[in-house]
Amino acid sequence: KMKLLNEILGTKYPIIQGGMANIATGEFAAACSNAGALGLIGSGGMDADSLRENIRRCRALTDKPFGVNIMLMHPQADEFAKIVVEEGVKLVTTGAGNPGKYMAAWKAAGITVIPVVAAAILAKHLEPLGIDAVIAEGTESGGHVGEMTTMALVPQVVDAVHVPVIAAGGIADGRGLAAALALGACGVQVGTCLLASTECPIHENYKAALLKARDSDTIVTGRIGGTPVRVLKNRMSREYVRQEKAGADKMALERFTLGSLRKAVFDGDTENGSLMAGQAAGLLHEVRPVEEIFAAMVSEAKDCIAGVYKEITL
C-alpha cells in the first residue's frame, strides 16, 4: 500500500500549503496546519529576523506540524538554513537550487527535507543527498515555473526516484487531488486555491481579481530572461512581456518589476502589481476558510476515486 502524505508528515490531510513569498506568514501557516494540512512559512520576501519571528509566531499558534520554504537563490539562504536548525523547525522545502550544502546540518537536526523540482532529472540528482520526498511542480502553478505540465511531470518523477512524490501545479479541488494520486503521487501541494481563503493575508482586491479570472487569464513573464513567472494578466504583466520581446535588458526589467509582488499583496494594486497565480485560478468562485477548502478537497477526491472505480469495467 502506498503511504499517503498525511501518514508521512503526521497531518490530517495529504496536503501541503505552498510557501508563497510575501503571503505565507507564520499566522497563515498556522491556520493551514490547524485546518489539517501542512502549513509552510514562505521565507521569500523575509529577512533573517522576520523569518525567526514568523517561526515563533507560528509555533505559538499551532501544536501541529509546520515547515519553512527556502528559496536557495535568496541572498540570505545560508542564514535561513541556520535559523531553521536553531528554531527547531522539523520540515523544510527548498526551491531554486541544490540544498546539498545544508543537508548534513539539517539531517543532524532531524529535519525532513523536501525539494521542489520541475524536471525528473533534477529529482534523480537530489535523491542521493538524503532528501525525504520531492515536490514535482508543473508549469500550471503560480509564481516561478518550469516547462513541463503536472500530468507529464509527476509520473516521470515517480518512476525516476524511490522517495515519495508530491504533486503541485494546477491542483485546486478534489479532482486534482484524485488525479495526482492516480499519477502515483502521495499527496499534493497547493497555493493558488488558498489565495482565495478567508485567512490568506493578501489584499481583498487581489482576491477579487482571482475570483474573476478564467482559464486563460494567466501569462508567463520572464521566459526570455530565464526567470519565468506565472501571473494574472494585467497592465504590468502585459507591459513586461512587451518590453521583454522588444529586447529590454535584464536590469531594466528588474527595475520595472521591483516591488511588484508587494504592490499586489499589500496595496491591492491589481494593474501594476504582480498577481502571482496558477492556471487553476479559473476554478475559484468564492472565498472560503482554509478548513473548508481542505475538507472539501479530500471529500471530493474520495467521491471521485470511488466514482471512477465504479465506472471502469476493464
Which sequence ranges carry the predicted segments?
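Residue-level detector of alpha-helix initiation sites
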Residues: 23, 171-172
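Active-site entrance/lid segments in N-terminal catalytic domains of soluble metabolic enzymes
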Residues: 1-164
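Conserved active-site-proximal phosphate/metal-binding subdomains
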Residues: 152-166, 172-314
